[in-house]
Amino acid sequence: MTATWEKKEGNEGVLSVTVPAEKVDKAIDQAFKKVVKQINVPGFRKGKVPRPIFEQRFGVEALYQDAVDILLPEAYGEAIDETGIKPVDQPEINVTSIEKGKEMTFEANVVVEPEVQLGDYKGLEVEKQDVELTDEELQESIDHQLGHLAEMVVKEDGAIENGDTVNIDFDGYVDGEQFEGGQAEGYDLEIGSGSFIPGFEEQLVGVKTGEEKDVNVTFPEEYHAEELAGKEATFKTKVNEIKYKDVPELTDEIANELDSEANTVDEYKENLRKRLTEQKETDAENNQKEEAINKAANNASIDVPDAMINTELDRMVQEFGQRMQQQGLNLETYFQISGQDESQLREQMKDDAEERVKTNLTLTAIADAEDIEVSDDDIDKELEKMSEQFNISVEDIKQTLGNTDIVKNDVRIQKVIDLLVDEAKLVEPSKDDSEA
């Protein structure tokens, strides 16, 4: 078999392939054995028609399409290996000739992985990260944890404050008319949560139980219900009940409830400070990696094919659907609630998908440029790490994966990321960032 690759514009080209006559004849023989089982010819049992009779009655050409179906997968795969191209999408194949006793030729229009023109990826400026835990950050975490132990208590007197949870009835109007979905009774709303239309929650602050208030808002221009987007609305609202959070005082007993390894408030604070500091160090390391990766990718020049973006979008939509399932929703329900459809979701994700593809291509190109290799020992260490992380045996991981190619690639990319960070130049955060 012979194959030649002719590059065209962009990331497209034509793969021209010639399959030897002996392989063609063998495929035609296989096609006959398959087709003859389905043929009825008077005077012969089904599946027992002699080859000469079949060809006389139907012509050998009747076998060509099945022969092509047999030949193409193997021939196309061998042609890819021979030319070294990296297709990123299904090809458009045109069989130019097939005949018994002769070579078969076909052409495949193929979109291939783009060439990556690497820019600077060593000596990148990466901002230093502040890993010192402040007393304010520690107290904020303590308050957050105590908040989980808070009890909701009915506020007998007094008005709504930020952080209260209120039970309300509301009836929404646009242009003096009620609109679908704008009414509810006995609805619980946490003031300050930002879960309602901007401006709604703030206007309830100061209202008391039993009081009514007209809340005037404007729907955002990007609101999912197009018929309401950008329109002014009035919600006639009644406050049925106000509850506030009764947050417990931090005592030794509460400290032990929050952290079973702490017997006193001081021990709890010490343990929490240690955990938060470790998390801050991890976050700082991840932020530096992300900044180095983004800069290396931005410095590279790549013409990303639409096919690769669409493949990445498929993966991202699937991941999004899995996250929705974890929250008890499927994609169909999400689309109904959000007023979106899949095409709109994909459009929102498109830029991120392109960035993902560009980043992966850049990291792979750096690995190639630096001749980064992965040893069997590297793979074994990664498998052991995965085994500890997921509490699954190494053998079970191997069986699930089928092979270690994915692990090998992950380790190779991680080595590239380590290289980027090791070669990076740490700089002080800009003034604007440090004041943020």
Swiss-Prot record:
Q: What are the protein's UniProt keywords?
A: Cell cycle, Cell division, Chaperone, Cytoplasm, Isomerase, Rotamase
Any domain commentary?
Consists of 3 domains; the N-terminus binds the ribosome, the middle domain has PPIase activity, while the C-terminus has intrinsic chaperone activity on its own.
Q: Which family does it belong to?
A: Belongs to the FKBP-type PPIase family. Tig subfamily.
Q: Which residues form the PPIase FKBP-type domain?
A: 163-248
**Pfam families linked:** FKBP_C (PF00254), Trigger_C (PF05698), Trigger_N (PF05697)
Q: What is its main location?
A: cytoplasm
The name this protein carries in UniProt is Trigger factor
**InterPro entries, per the entry:** PPIase_dom_sf (IPR046357), PPIase_FKBP_dom (IPR001179), Trig_fac (IPR005215), Trigger_fac_C (IPR008880), Trigger_fac_C_sf (IPR037041), Trigger_fac_ribosome-bd_bac (IPR008881), Trigger_fac_ribosome-bd_sf (IPR036611), Trigger_fact/SurA_dom_sf (IPR027304)
Can you name one GO molecular function term for this protein? protein folding chaperone
Role noted for this protein: Involved in protein export. Acts as a chaperone by maintaining the newly synthesized protein in an open conformation. Functions as a peptidyl-prolyl cis-trans isomerase.
Any Gene Ontology CC annotation: cytoplasm
Q: Any idea where this protein resides? A: Cytoplasm
Q: What is its EC number?
A: 5.2.1.8
Which reaction is the catalytic activity of this chain?
A: [protein]-peptidylproline (omega=180) = [protein]-peptidylproline (omega=0)
Q: What taxonomic classification does the UniProt entry list for its organism? A: Bacteria, Bacillati, Bacillota, Bacilli, Bacillales
**One BP term from GO:** chaperone-mediated protein folding
